Design a protein with these regions (language model features):
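Residues within well-ordered alpha-helical secondary structure of globular protein domains
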Residues: 17-20, 48, 72, 97, ...
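Basic/polar phosphate-binding segments, predominantly the helix-turn-helix DNA-binding elements
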Residues: 25-61, 80-105, 109
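C-terminal regulatory/oligomerization modules of transcriptional regulators
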Residues: 114-117
Length: 117
């Protein structure tokens, strides 16, 4: 099926919304309803454009933001709370999946790296 411009525009709006609301849990269904398209169509367009589903992409954005916070001295529990993770364990699970180490290890590596600059 060829891309549907209406669906792609909705996917871009969802992406922009996620960037501005990292800590909020997104409801793809509610967003799609607002856009007058089905959730399935929105997810399909989003995945075609960004290679991940909206939920996967939002998690990647949150973990990337956690990296920034940790690099700037935040602790994992503060980062988890600020970015909408249910708790520090949730951040740690997602962080390990995406980055390959715990938030604490990442922060320690970043801190050790600063001493060499």
């Amino acid at each position: 099926n060829p891309p549907n411009p209406k669906h792609e525009e909705a996917a871009v709006r969802l992406y922009a919304h996620m960037l501005g609301h990292l800590a909020e849990r997104i409801s793809v269904g509610a967003f799609a309803k607002n856009e007058n398209i089905s959730a399935y169509a929105l997810i399909r367009a989003y995945k075609r454009m960004f290679a991940l589903t909206p939920v996967q992409y939002q998690m990647a954005l949150r973990v990337d933001a956690a990296c920034e916070l940790l690099a700037n001295g935040a602790n994992a529990s503060d980062a988890a709370a600020e970015l909408g993770f249910s708790d520090q364990a949730h951040l740690t699970r997602e962080f390990k999946k995406r980055i390959g180490c715990t938030p604490g290890s990442y922060a320690a590596m970043r801190k050790a790296g600063e001493g060499r600059e």
